Regions:
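Phosphate/pyrophosphate-binding loop motifs in nucleotide- or prenyl diphosphate-using proteins
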Residues: 3
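Helix-start/capping segments and mature chain N-termini
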Residues: 6, 11-211
Length: 211
């Protein structure tokens, strides 16, 4: 379920005060199509299109203007239709994907792009809280491609994915392709315990289905 609110339709009348337009949409989660991701991991690609800099549009505001992210996604999927795009900023640091946040793990330290430069997704926040409760070391910092290519583990978070492991970044395989890695698996279990649903099993139960 998604809620969208706009400022309403503008009028030429001087004293016109627009009233908000409210839209509520529902979308079916593509369980069958995504189920394999929990066995094989996501193939993550960083397109050449950079994320719009925060000085132009703050990424912390959920404006539903996804054009920049969609263009990056289209570029990534032109070379790999199953790829998930995460855009870099103008300095070559990771930002976010369309509706997703990215995490990397190196030497038992969990890192994610600074919340000042991404939309602070609800699932992202939950994962940071879970990591703190589990006593894991967490950093919000600049993460470049070298960090990604040398990571021990990686995963994406989103409302529908929850936590999904990453198999590779631009073709560079993470953790010899073993997914999920141990810390990712620990966080996935903690997330399932928190929400009261084994979301991985929920996805995997659709493996034999088609959508």
């Amino acid at each position: 379920v998604m809620q969208r609110i706009s400022r309403g339709v503008e009028s030429s009348e001087i004293d016109f005060v627009p009233s908000p337009t409210l839209l509520i949409e529902t979308h079916a989660i593509p369980f069958a199509r995504r189920a394999i991701l929990y066995q094989e991991g996501i193939r993550l690609v960083t397109p050449t299109i950079p994320r719009v800099p925060p000085r132009f549009i703050s990424p912390r505001a959920k404006t539903h203007n996804y054009l920049n992210l969609i263009l990056g996604e289209l570029e990534a999927q032109a070379s790999d239709p199953e790829a998930w795009a995460v855009l870099l900023d103008e300095n070559g640091n990771f930002t976010e994907g369309r509706g997703s946040n990215v995490f990397f793990i190196k030497d038992n330290v969990l890192s994610t792009p600074d919340g000042q430069f991404v939309l602070d997704g609800i699932t992202r926040g939950i994962v940071l809280s879970l990591a703190a409760n589990l006593g894991l070391s967490v950093e919000e910092r600049n993460i470049d491609l070298f960090d990604a290519y040398t990571a021990d583990e990686a995963f994406l978070t989103s409302t529908s994915l929850c936590i999904c492991p990453v198999h590779s970044v631009n073709g560079t395989v993470v953790n010899d392709g073993v997914v999920p890695g141990p810390m990712t698996k620990q966080l996935m279990g903690a997330f399932s315990d928190l929400v009261g649903v084994d979301f991985v099993e929920q996805y995997l139960s659709h493996l034999s289905h088609s959508e």
